[in-house]
Amino acid sequence: MEESSSRNTNYSEDEENEELSSRVWIESKKLWRIVGPNIINRLAGYSMTVITQAFAGHLGNVELASISIATNIIVGFGFALLLGMASALETLCGQAFGAKRYHMLGTYMQRSWIVLFFCCILLLPVYIFASPILKLMGQSDDVAEQSGMVALWLIPLQFSYAFQFPLQRFLQSQLKNSVTLWFSLAVLVLHAVTSWVLVYELDFGVVGAAMALDISWWVWGLGLFWYVSSGRCPQSWAGFSMQAFSGFWEFVKFSAASGVMRCLEFWSYRILILMTGSLEKATLAMDALTICMTISGWELMIHWAFLVGTGVRVANELGAGNWKATKFAAMVSMAESVFIGLCICVITIILHDKLAYIFTSSTDVVQEVGQMSYLLAMAILLNSIQPILTGIVVGTGLQAWVAYINLFCYYIIGLPLAFVMGWIRHLGVSGIWGGMIFGGTAVQTVILAIVLIRHDWEKEAQKASQRAKKWSTPNPDNQIQEHK
């Protein structure tokens, strides 16, 4: 009975009557086929930045602050835009693959390369004038000068994003997750070795840490391109083509819409780092906040993988008209994500006075991070809930809801509350971060939960089935207009 139900995606009455443990096991296997490779891939990519910050942190507090601002603010400004615009391929390549128009995958990827590389050129002034921009934002002269110098060395990193992001989505749309997984693990090892050689053996210091990041990301991107161009994707890649310029403007508008929505969410937490630059002992405050946000972001990669898995499982079951299976898939994903989050939460509290030693040897920074450990634990707990709720909402096709909820929670409530707690209530860096956690992430989690509790799942399943029939067109180019 279990064997047949694991092969059948339809939620039958027999499945409903199975033992709960058996149903959970079957659903978990379906979920982890998606989540497992995504966790490793995301952790590897994020860990490269963590390794870079760790090497810089052991050089000194100013070095840690400068590499943190350069990677989180300067590079992060373009990272969010490029990542969001590349996410348009998740829709377009997925539709082309489903319609068996495999040649269009390569065409869409080339269009994305053109758009993203052009965006990189437009973003160059942010890197070139990083130092004066940071000074205008209130950063100290020593941190702003060194951050600007590091930013110049990170220009190749931005172009590597434009090259690698479309490649990842091109492969993922063809269910080749294992390819990106193994490449990411290999590059992670390479990055650790390269960082050690450049920072310590060749004594390049913080510049060496930035160079290692450039090298690792370009090796990752070129490795994926070698896989694609070496004949392993014969139906979807036939080389470069002028067809990439056909329908180019519609593609630009579709990509830009995805990019703007991603930026609104991503930039809100980066603004916090700039806000701490105006506090007393700004370098200490920025170092502590950066370490806490880095640990939180590291752990968040696990739950972002759950977001992807939940969205796929919910979309699959809704598309099949199985609204009961949709609710069950959502509950299993939520339970497993929260369990992982609670475990990491407990570890964080136990090791609250030791976590910062990964990034720095400064006693003052370690003590400041220790004082913020309970906020870090709360952020980790919310990380285990909020992405899953987002994945469920996105899986139901309510992406616009998520965008408006994010805008309201982070910019209308979160950032103003962070300002009040940090300056008016004089709670410093803990108040700034706490204001965003409770005013932004916590409120967003509650609103998403209310939306889902009040949701009519049976009606949504009917709408999803109708939508699938409507969008089952042989020409994916035409679907750009329907998504707008």
Positions of PLM-derived features:
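Hydrophobic faces of transmembrane alpha-helices in multi-pass small-molecule transporters and flippases
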Residues: 24-47, 151, 155, 174, ...
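Alpha-helical transmembrane segments of multi-pass membrane proteins
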Residues: 77, 125-126, 141-167, 182-183, ...
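Small-residue-rich hydrophobic transmembrane alpha-helices
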Residues: 50-53, 64-124, 128, 164-173, ...
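Membrane-interface helix-loop junctions in multi-pass transport and translocation proteins
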Residues: 24-27, 177-222, 226, 284, ...
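Helix-terminus/linker motif at the lipid-water interface of multi-pass membrane proteins
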Residues: 46-65, 134-141, 197-204, 259, ...
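Interhelical loop/hinge segments that connect adjacent transmembrane helices in multipass membrane
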Residues: 2-36, 206, 210-218, 222-274, ...
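Interfacial segments at transmembrane-helix termini and the short loops linking adjacent helices
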Residues: 25, 134-154, 278-287, 351-377, ...
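Hydrophobic transmembrane helix module of multi-pass membrane transport proteins
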Residues: 2-4, 116-222, 226
